[in-house]
Regions:
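Secondary-structure edge/capping motif, primarily at the C-terminal ends of alpha-helices
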Residues: 109-116, 135, 139, 174-177, ...
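Extended amphipathic alpha-helical interaction segments
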Residues: 155-243
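A cross-kingdom marker for long, charged
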Residues: 229-305
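C-terminal motif of bacterial Sec signal peptides marking the signal peptidase cleavage site
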Residues: 22-25
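Non-transmembrane, amphipathic alpha-helical segments
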Residues: 90-97, 109-116, 120, 148-151, ...
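N-terminal Sec/ER secretory leader and immediately downstream segment
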Residues: 34-148
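Bacterial N-terminal signal peptides that target proteins for export
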Residues: 2-14
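Bacterial signal peptide processing site
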Residues: 27-31
Length: 305
């Protein structure tokens, strides 16, 4: 890839690679004719209900790409000093450290791609590939998938739909191969990194009417999903330890007020249809913000060290 390509080309190239990582063994088994593989599995009704519940939890979390897009739309600017240096990749030798930092690096890659950082994207592609390969979840993307992405090179919404769909397939692949703990740690790493990047760009003296602060406080809602996901996989000692770490953040978020505003009734253009409107309102004090930023920074730095 040329460093002089247009921003749209850089974005699509990065998305192809993010897709490559997140399909995690799914896309490589699909051909242009969409061949189907059949499995015969005996599941009780309780097992099926458990599987659907777990999938609902995994799918409720934003992908690293969605997190990066939310950061940018909330007013974040590019700051490479906030990223986990790619030189650290050789440190990650355990399943826990590799899974957490796969989530972290994938979020870094998404963030860099949205700000058109060509060389940085290539560096993070390599680091992410190494971790995914070491975890045994790397597979090739077939030519049909790449063609679909290239056909929509200038349509970020379509690209996001494709990536999000296959991010869910990634979680399914890990679950169906009894690797839910790896998926849980990977998703938690990405969640923490998104919060860390947002916190790193907010001045504690400018909390009022700040879109990034709104993004940060809204994380309280998705944290409930993260904690439930970790609880469901706490039979794994690595996940149990991670859950204990995340409880520190959960305790701080209890001090953050997030609620829905009163419902307002307005008329549509038709005047025969009433439209109900409500917004999420949040508030965080300076002291709580400081505590949250300090705790998240310490925890995230322990993940990447």
């Amino acid at each position: 890839m040329s460093l002089n390509k247009a921003p749209a080309g850089l974005f699509a190239s990065s998305i192809v690679f993010i897709f490559f990582i997140l399909t995690s063994g799914c896309a490589g088994d699909c051909s242009r004719q969409q061949k189907e593989r059949e499995f015969t599995i005996d599941l009780s009704e309780d097992s099926i209900e458990d599987l659907m519940r777990v999938k609902k939890i995994f799918y409720s979390l934003p992908s690293p790409l969605e997190t990066a897009m939310l950061l940018k739309s909330s007013g974040a600017v590019y700051n490479e000093e906030l990223l986990n240096p790619v030189e650290n990749v050789s440190r990650y030798l355990t399943n826990r450290s590799m899974a957490l930092n796969l989530g972290i690096y994938t979020t870094n890659l998404s963030y860099a791609s949205l700000f058109d950082q060509a060389q940085t994207c290539m560096d993070y592609m390599d680091a992410t590939r190494r971790l995914a390969d070491n975890l045994g979840i790397l597979d090739a993307v077939d030519s049909y998938t790449i063609e679909r992405l290239e056909e929509n090179i200038n349509n970020r919404e379509v690209i996001l739909d494709i990536v999000s769909e296959n991010f869910m397939n990634s979680s399914s692949f890990l679950q169906e191969n009894n690797r839910e703990p790896v998926a849980a740690m990977m998703l938690t790493g990405g969640w923490i990194e998104g919060l860390y990047l947002a916190l790193g760009q907010v001045d504690e003296n400018e909390l009022e009417n700040n879109r990034l602060v709104r993004m940060i406080t809204d994380k309280k809602l998705s944290l409930e999903i993260v904690m439930l996901m970790l609880e469901n996989n706490s039979h794994n000692s690595d996940v149990a330890d991670l859950k204990a770490d995340m409880e520190k953040i959960e305790n701080i978020f209890r001090e953050v007020d997030v609620h829905s505003s009163p419902v307002e009734v307005t008329q549509s253009g038709d005047e025969t249809v009433a439209v109900l409107r409500s917004a999420t309102v949040s508030n965080i004090s300076r002291d709580v913000f400081r505590q949250l930023k300090s705790t998240v920074t310490d925890l995230r730095n322990s993940f990447v060290s």
